[in-house]
A protein has these predicted regions:
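A conserved beta-strand element that flanks and buttresses the S-adenosyl-L-methionine
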Residues: 73
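A short glycine-rich, Lys/Arg-flanked "PGG" loop and its adjoining helix->strand segment in the class I
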Residues: 65, 87-99
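Local beta-strand N-terminus motif with an aromatic residue
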Residues: 69-70
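Short catalytic micro-motifs in class I SAM-dependent methyltransferases
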Residues: 76-77
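Short glycine-rich, flexible loops that bind phosphorylated cofactors or substrates
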Residues: 80-81, 112
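Class I (Rossmann-like) S-adenosyl-L-methionine-dependent methyltransferase catalytic domain
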Residues: 1-5, 10-61, 88, 102-191
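A short, conserved alpha-helix within the catalytic core of class I
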Residues: 53, 81-92
Length: 191
């Protein structure tokens, strides 16, 4: 765990939301002295992480105005979402980003290399195809979901986003650790 002092720099703001009440409460407590930090719990349904959630992920509207952020970050979010939910969250990221704004998101991207490594038993997650999905557990797909690389451009273009640089491949499927466990996608809002 590393500590930085970026929270003492007061230009701008940091706004976050999550479906994990305990995580939000921790952030609210530890960042309370810094008025430019704001965290809120959202009661969004997720079969794995928040099965009693009252708001559908496909209908959730981020609690922020249009064009309000320079940067958005979503770590280990799309790895637990169904395709229609991913589409909505990408649309929402696009909506809240300013023109030219960027986002860093993580995902499990399924391509030929990942499929070969999973088939060879090198992956930390035993993904398998179930219908249109590539999941760890067919009974609770939201436990871990991979996005087909061939579908990624469609998701992004439909949301008005594009990749801003190459995908930084993660080590989840047995690749050497280079950048991260999950695949890193740097996105940019289209003008």
């Amino acid at each position: 765990h590393t500590h930085t002092h970026t929270h003492t720099h007061t230009a701008g703001s940091y706004d976050g939301f999550d479906i994990d009440k305990n995580g939000v409460a921790w952030c609210q407590k530890h960042y309370a002295p810094y008025s430019h930090f704001s965290f809120q719990y959202v009661d969004v349904f997720n079969k794995y992480y928040n099965p009693k959630g009252q708001i559908k992920s496909t209908e959730f509207r981020f609690p922020y105005p249009d064009n309000s952020f320079d940067f958005a970050f979503a770590t280990s979010v799309f790895t637990h979402m169904l395709p229609d939910e991913i589409a909505n969250y990408l649309n929402e990221i696009q909506r809240v980003l300013k023109v030219g704004g960027t986002a860093l998101v993580t995902a499990f991207i399924w391509n030929d290399e990942a499929a070969e490594l999973v088939a060879a038993g090198k992956s930390t997650i035993a993904f398998a195809t179930h219908g249109d999905l590539i999941v760890k557990d067919k009974n609770i797909p939201e436990d871990a979901i991979a996005i087909r690389h061939s579908d990624l451009d469609n998701y992004l273009s439909a949301a008005g986003l594009t990749l801003d640089g190459p995908i930084r491949w993660g080590s989840w499927c047995g690749r050497p650790e280079e950048h991260s466990y999950q695949d890193l996608l740097h996105l940019k809002k289209l003008d």
